[in-house]
Amino acid sequence: MALRTGGPALVVLLAFWVALGPCHLQGTDPGASADAEGPQCPVACTCSHDDYTDELSVFCSSKNLTHLPDDIPVSTRALWLDGNNLSSIPSAAFQNLSSLDFLNLQGSWLRSLEPQALLGLQNLYYLHLERNRLRNLAVGLFTHTPSLASLSLSSNLLGRLEEGLFQGLSHLWDLNLGWNSLVVLPDTVFQGLGNLHELVLAGNKLTYLQPALFCGLGELRELDLSRNALRSVKANVFVHLPRLQKLYLDRNLITAVAPGAFLGMKALRWLDLSHNRVAGLMEDTFPGLLGLHVLRLAHNAIASLRPRTFKDLHFLEELQLGHNRIRQLGERTFEGLGQLEVLTLNDNQITEVRVGAFSGLFNVAVMNLSGNCLRSLPERVFQGLDKLHSLHLEHSCLGHVRLHTFAGLSGLRRLFLRDNSISSIEEQSLAGLSELLELDLTTNRLTHLPRQLFQGLGHLEYLLLSYNQLTTLSAEVLGPLQRAFWLDISHNHLETLAEGLFSSLGRVRYLSLRNNSLQTFSPQPGLERLWLDANPWDCSCPLKALRDFALQNPGVVPRFVQTVCEGDDCQPVYTYNNITCAGPANVSGLDLRDVSETHFVHC
């Protein structure tokens, strides 16, 4: 569909430009011909003749034309008139262009099309009329384009469509009516479009869909009704769409979905009901959707989830329920979702998750529970989620991690616990996470780490502990992290680092110690980036090795790093990495790298 996937129009656009490769471009000068012995190219246009296909394309885009060129060659196959100031298309304007199969009139300030404007275009395949000022279209306008496969009328001012407007377009495949001002559609407006595969009605003002509206559209694959003013989804509206695969109902005003509203839609793979006002889901809301893979219900007003609500969705792979008002997850909430891979429940009001809430989710790989207020999670609440590899619990009011909170997550790769209030983590509570690669504990209230906290995490590569209240860090704690690559312990209260703290971490390449209370530090070999700023460094003899290391490796310990900037108005941002001396007094305020060699002469 043009709106969601780029659509045939974009494919054609690219195809024509690719075709220019072997073409001989002419016509940039008035009177230039498209071929040495061929027809003349219109003044102010550019012509391209493909020697391989023997097809002629005429480009008259953005020439500020107020009327159509008079001398368009009759052999033209593609005509680009977009971006002009045409106002209207008179009758029989293209009557001599019987070979034309592509016509682009988008963005040309068209206010009207005469009923016979398309006369003679019996071979036209693609017609672009989007981004104009059209308010109405005469019945019979398209009777002259029986071969039309793609018609785009999006972003006009259409307030109504007459019955019979699309009569005779039996080959139409793609129809885009999005971003107009349509309020009501005639019952039979789409009759005769038996081959239609993609229909866009997004961005209109539709408040109601009558049951007969989609009769005869048995081949339809995608239907976009997003960004309208629909208030409910009635039964039997979509019953005539047995082959529909994608249905977009997002960003409407829907408060209720009738029982069996989607009955018979066995081919449906994608259903988007996000950004509405749906308050509740019933057990009979989704019966019959045996082929559904994606269900999006985020940004609604759902307050609770009843058991067995999703029982018929055996092949569902993605379920989005974020940004609702769900308060509790009870047992068997997700029963029947054995193929589910992605479950998002972020930014609800969940305060309680009962053991058994996630039972049956044998294949779930990503779970997002962030933005709730769980405070604590019952032990073994994630039991049985053997294939879960990413668990998001950010900003969830967690204060404590119990011994068996994460029991059963043997395949977990990424655990996100940042922006909580975690002040304690029980010893070995992470021991079962043998496949963990990334652990994010940023912005919590940790003052110390249990000695065996990371026992069993031999595969961990990324450990983020910044913005806590750590005062000490023992070598025994980090010892098991043999594969640690990225270590961030910035913004803590560390005053000293234990001897040999990082010696066992031979793979560490990124180390951030900024914003602590460190006075000394011995550099580690193998580092690729070291952040040391905002510490009260004692620039006496013990820091000479760090000075030499920093001077010899400016790429590892840069004075500043410029953030990559994009856009014309983007201002570069610099992150500084100062090693500012707090003492002795004679070098106080200097950067360690600027302290002279004579200062260390007696070391």
Swiss-Prot record:
InterPro entries named among the record's database cross-references: Cys-rich_flank_reg_C (IPR000483), Dev_Immune_Receptor (IPR050328), Leu-rich_rpt (IPR001611), Leu-rich_rpt_typical-subtyp (IPR003591), LRR_dom_sf (IPR032675), LRRNT (IPR000372)
Record keywords, A-Z: Cell adhesion, Disulfide bond, Glycoprotein, Leucine-rich repeat, Repeat, Secreted, Signal
Lineage: Eukaryota, Metazoa, Chordata, Craniata, Vertebrata
Residues of the LRRNT domain: 32-74
The encoding gene: Igfals
Organism whose genome encodes this protein: Rattus norvegicus
Domain LRRCT: from-to ranges: 535-603
Keyword Disulfide bond in record: yes
Name used for this protein in its record: Insulin-like growth factor-binding protein complex acid labile subunit
Gene Ontology biological process terms from the UniProt entry: cell adhesion; cellular response to dexamethasone stimulus; cellular response to epidermal growth factor stimulus; cellular response to growth hormone stimulus; cellular response to interleukin-1; response to nutrient levels
Iron among keywords: no
One term of GO molecular function: insulin-like growth factor binding
Tissue and organ expression note: Brain, kidney, lung, heart, spleen, muscle and liver.
Signal sequence annotation: 1-23
Compartments it resides in: Secreted, Extracellular space
Biological role: May have an important role in regulating the access of circulating IGFs to the tissues.
Cellular compartments per GO CC: extracellular matrix; extracellular space; insulin-like growth factor ternary complex
Record-annotated disulphide pairs: 41-47, 45-60, 539-581, 541-603, 565-570
Residues bearing carbohydrate: 64, 85, 96, 368, 515, 578, 586
LRR repeat windows: 75-96, 99-120, 123-144, 147-168, 171-192, 195-216, 219-240, 243-264, 267-288, 291-312, 315-336, 339-360, 363-384, 387-408, 411-432, 435-456, 459-480, 483-504, 507-528
Subunit relationships: Forms a ternary complex with IGF1 and IGFBP3.
